[in-house]
């Protein structure tokens, strides 16, 4: 699956610990080959037709928007605790 990432996504990713960055890279490659791989938990966010989340290990998540060409634009990555707060705000 094709994807892009926003400058903000890269900023957030680069602020994460090196081991989390490496895991995000590994999971991205897996997602690009098989978005439905069970370990990724790639899923549409509740109440949203175009927002998706993907697992980055047990403690981190990334959020992306479905774009016109069918790909995903990654917009956010952070801890699961921050992810939970974001979902409560919507």
How does the language model describe each region?
Residues 25-27, 45-48, 80-81, 85:
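Short, charge- and proline-biased low-complexity linear segments
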Residues 11, 35-40, 78-81:
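Residue-level signal for pocket-adjacent positions within structured domains
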Residues 2-4, 56-90:
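Enriched for short, Lys/Arg-rich terminal
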Residues 18, 36-39, 63:
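Hydrophobic residues in alpha-helical membrane-spanning segments
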Residues 10, 28-31, 74-76:
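Tryptophan-centered motif/residue detector
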């Amino acid at each position: 699956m094709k994807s892009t990432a926003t400058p903000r996504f890269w900023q957030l990713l680069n602020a994460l610990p090196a081991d989390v960055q490496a895991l995000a890279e590994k999971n991205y490659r897996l997602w690009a080959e098989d978005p439905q791989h069970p370990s990724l938990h790639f899923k549409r966010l509740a109440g949203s037709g175009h927002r998706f989340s993907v697992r980055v290990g047990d403690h981190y998540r990334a959020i992306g928007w479905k774009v016109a060409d069918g790909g995903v634009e990654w917009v956010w990555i952070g801890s699961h605790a921050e992810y939970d707060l974001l979902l409560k705000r919507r």
